[in-house]
UniProtKB/Swiss-Prot annotation:
This is RNA-splicing ligase RtcB homolog. GO terms for molecular function: GTP binding; metal ion binding; RNA ligase (GTP) activity. Gene3D superfamilies: tRNA-splicing ligase RtcB (3.90.1860.10). The keyword Signal does not apply.
Length: 505
C-alpha cells in the first residue's frame, strides 16, 4: 500500500538550510537515517520527484532519489547514515550522488555493485598549462580538431595505444604504474591521482574473459554519454592559496579536463557481479527493499571477487585517463610546435566518482574500518590527511567537479567538516534533471550545438544525435550543486573554470 505525498512528508525533516533528514520508517527496515543536501532550487526538484511518484508516476525506470537513499539505509552493516549529495538523482539501485559506508568488522555488512555504478572509476582529471586564453583563442578550432583527431571518441571507439592481451592483464593489475612503465605517463602524474592511480587489491583473474574482450580495444578512448575532454580557462579564483598550490595563478590560464571511466570493461564487471550476487543473496538470506540493490557480504567469495574485479576495472580507468593525457599532451605540443614539458601540462589531480574503498573513519567517537561506497560522489579529504599528496597537505584534497557541455566546472577542496558529516565525500557534477529519453524528446541537437557556438565554444562531437542528452538543460545547475556543498561546509570552492572547447563522444 503506497502512502500519500502528505504521509511521506511526515518522515522528512529540515535540519538546516542545506540539509534534510529522512527518518526511519520512510521505507521498511531502515538501519540508520538518511540525509540529503540541497538548496532551495534543488530541494524543489527532489520533492517534485517524490510527489510525482506518489501520484503513480513512479512506474517505469527508477524509484525517486529520496526512496533510494532510504532503501540504502536498510542495507545490512550500514553505519552512521545514508547520504545524498546535492547532485543526487535516481539511478540503478543506489541513486547517483548517494554514498554509504559499511562496517568491515560486521560479518553481515555488504558490498553492492549498485553503490559503485556500472562505469567503475568514472572520474575526472585536470591538467594545467602555462598558456593564456589569448594564446589559445586564435588556434582554438585547430586545437579542438587536434584533440578530436588524437583521442578516439564515441560509442564503439577503438584505442590507438598498442595493446595485447598480456598488456591488458598488466594494466588491470598495475594501473598508472603500467602507463608509467610504457612511457604514457610522467612520474609526477601518479602523485596527483587518488590512490596514486593503482588499487592494490586488483586481481585481473576476477575480470571475466568477456569484460577483457570489451576492454582490450577501448583503452585510451573517451566513450560516449557524459564523457568529454574540455579545454577550459580559469574564470574565477576563490582560494588563491589553494590555487597556487595547484599551479593556477591567474584568471585566463588554460586547463584541460578529461572525464572518462572504464568503458565496456567496467560495465561487464558490474553486470557479472550482479548475476553472482543474486545467487549469494538467496544462499545467505539477505533481504533488500529493491532488487536492484543486489549485494553480497563483504567477506563472502562473491563480495571479495567483486572488490578485486572492481579494483582492476578502476586501474583500467586510470590507465585510460593516463592514455588520454598522453594524447592530449601530444595534440597540444603539435599545435604549439613545442613539447608538453614546455607547456607545463601537469596533472593537477585525478579523482574517481564511482568506486568503493576501504577507509578509516571516526564513527560515534571510535575509529572504524569501513567500506565506503561512492557513486556519483567524490572523495574530499581534509588538510593533513595521510592519503593525499604532499603538495596538497595544507590545502586539502583537490576535488574536480565537471559541468556539462557549455557550463562551468569547479575545483573544490576537502574539509574537516566533510570528514565528520559525509565520510570525506562531496558532489561530483551537476546531476541529471531530465532523463536521457526526455532530453531527446524535448531538445533538438542542432539548437544545442548552435547555442554552444554562440557562446564561443569550439565543439567536436562523434555522435551529434546524442548531444541533447548532455545539454545543460538536461542537468541541475552545477553552480547550485557546488554552492550547496560549500555552504554546508562539506567542501570549499577554490577555482571556477569555463569551457572554450568541448570534445565529446
Amino acid at each position: 500500500m503506497s502512502r500519500s505525498y502528505n504521509d511521506e512528508l511526515q518522515f522528512l525533516e529540515k535540519i538546516n538550510k542545506n540539509c534534510w533528514r529522512i527518518r526511519k520508517g520512510f521505507v521498511p527496515n531502515m538501519q540508520v537515517e538518511g540525509v540529503f543536501y540541497v538548496n532551495d532550487a534543488l530541494e524543489k526538484l527532489m520533492f517534485e520527484e517524490l510527489r510525482n511518484a506518489c501520484r503513480g508516476g513512479g512506474v517505469g525506470g527508477f524509484l525517486p532519489a529520496m526512496k533510494q537513499i532510504g532503501n540504502v539505509a536498510a542495507l545490512p552493516g550500514i553505519v552512521h547514515r545514508s547520504i545524498g549529495l546535492p547532485d543526487v538523482h535516481s539511478g540503478y539501485g543506489f541513486a547517483i550522488g548517494n554514498m554509504a559506508a559499511f562496517d568491515m568488522n560486521d560479518p553481515e555488512a555488504v558490498v553492492s555493485p549498485g553503490g559503485v555504478g556500472f562505469d567503475i572509476n568514472c572520474g575526472v582529471r585536470l591538467l594545467r598549462t602555462n598558456l593564456d586564453e589569448s594564446d589559445v583563442q586564435p588556434v582554438k578550432e585547430q586545437l579542438a580538431q587536434a584533440m578530436f583527431d588524437h583521442i578516439p571518441v564515441g560509442v564503439g571507439s577503438k584505442g590507438v595505444i598498442p595493446m595485447n592481451a598480456k598488456d591488458l592483464e598488466e594494466a588491470l593489475e598495475m594501473g598508472v604504474d603500467w602507463s608509467l612503465r610504457e612511457g604514457y605517463a610522467w612520474a609526477e602524474d601518479k602523485e596527483h591521482c587518488e590512490e596514486y592511480g593503482r588499487m592494490l587489491q586488483a586481481d585481473p583473474n576476477k575480470v571475466s574473459a568477456r569484460a577483457k574482450k570489451r576492454g582490450l580495444p577501448q583503452l585510451g578512448t573517451l566513450g560516449a554519454g557524459n564523457h568529454y575532454a574540455e579545454i577550459q580557462v580559469v574564470d574565477e579564483i576563490f582560494n588563491e592559496y589553494a590555487a597556487k598550490k595547484m599551479g593556477i595563478d591567474h584568471k585566463g590560464q588554460v586547463c584541460v579536463m578529461i572525464h572518462s571511466g572504464s568503458r565496456g570493461l567496467g560495465h561487464q564487471v558490474a553486470t557479472d557481479a550482479l548475476v553472482a550476487m543474486e545467487k549469494a543473496m538467496k544462499r545467505d538470506k539477505i533481504i533488500v527493499n529493491d532488487r536492484q540493490l543486489a549485494c553480497a557480504r563483504i567477506a563472502s567469495p562473491e563480495g571479495q571477487d567483486y572488490l578485486k574485479g572492481m579494483a582492476a576495472a578502476g586501474n583500467y580507468a586510470w590507465v585510460n585517463r593516463s592514455s588520454m593525457t598522453f594524447l592530449t599532451r601530444q595534440a597540444f605540443a603539435k599545435v604549439f610546435n613545442t613539447t608538453p614539458d614546455d607547456l607545463d601540462l601537469h596533472v593537477i589531480y585525478d579523482v574517481s566518482h564511482n568506486i568503493a574503498k576501504v577507509e578509516q573513519h571516526v564513527v560515534d567517537g571510535k575509529e572504524r574500518t569501513l567500506l565506503v561506497h561512492r557513486k556519483g560522489s567524490t572523495r574530499a579529504f581534509p588538510p593533513h590527511h595521510p592519503l593525499i599528496a604532499v603538495d596538497y597537505q595544507l590545502t586539502g584534497q583537490p576535488v574536480l567537479i565537471g559541468g556539462t557541455m557549455g557550463t562551468c566546472s569547479y575545483v573544490l577542496t576537502g574539509t574537516e567538516q566533510g570528514m565528520t558529516e559525509t565520510f570525506g565525500t562531496t558532489c561530483h557534477g551537476a546531476g541529471r534533471a531530465l532523463s536521457r529519453a526526455k532530453s531527446r524528446r524535448n531538445l533538438d541537437f542542432q539548437d544545442v550545438l548552435d547555442k554552444l557556438a554562440d557562446m564561443g565554444i569550439a565543439i567536436r562531437v562523434a555522435s551529434p544525435k546524442l548531444v541533447m542528452e548532455e545539454a545543460p538543460e538536461s542537468y541541475k545547475n552545477v553552480t547550485d550543486v557546488v554552492n550547496t556543498c560549500h555552504d554546508a561546509g562539506i567542501s570549499k570552492k577554490a577555482i571556477k573554470l569555463r569551457p572554450i572547447a568541448v570534445i565529446k563522444g
